[in-house]
Amino acid sequence: MSFSGRWIGEFQTHSIPWRPGIHKRESRTGRSGHEHFPGLILPEIGARNTVGRAYGFHYGWSGGHQMIAEELPDGRRQIQFGHACDSHNGPAQSFETAKLYAVFSDRGLNGCATAFQRHLRDHILTFPKASLPRPVHYNCWEAIYFDHDLGSLKDIATRAKDLGAERFVLDDGWFGRRDADSSSLGDW
């Protein structure tokens, strides 16, 4: 299972069966995102959200990257992740790739998600005062999309504050006449 997407259609799942040869996904845009997510889930036959065995991989890099899934002629399978092909140094220079995070779950696909989230919270995004509640932000994008009416925004911000939000994020559409995803973003 791999993932791709675009604006308002993020994280579309693509199930591609193993077959002899190479399946390659690559992003040379210089960034990762929902259109080129640097990750993969390999569920065993019969695995679903809460049952079965699954392996998850996430390449910890936000730049150009590639993923290769290969079934060898003898039936063995291998996975490779790394920087995009043009990411190399000159002679006599070293190059170190990003980390590849890998998990195994015998509790289905959700078990992979839980393991990734636990590792992220315990080892990557640690908070100095873990016993205190974490800051809450409210992003209004999905509540209003392109309809930036000041009265509605104030009402939503007040309700977010009442729920404990410490920051109100006005996401998208604050410049010009932004009424579609094809204009005005940053036209200020």
What are the functions of these language-model segments?
Residues 79, 125, 140-143:
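A general structural-boundary detector
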Residues 131-188:
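Aromatic-lined carbohydrate-binding/catalytic grooves of carbohydrate-active enzymes
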Residues 120-130:
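Long, charged amphipathic helices and adjacent flexible linkers at domain junctions
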Residues 26, 122-124, 154, 174:
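Residue-level detector of functional hotspots within protein domains
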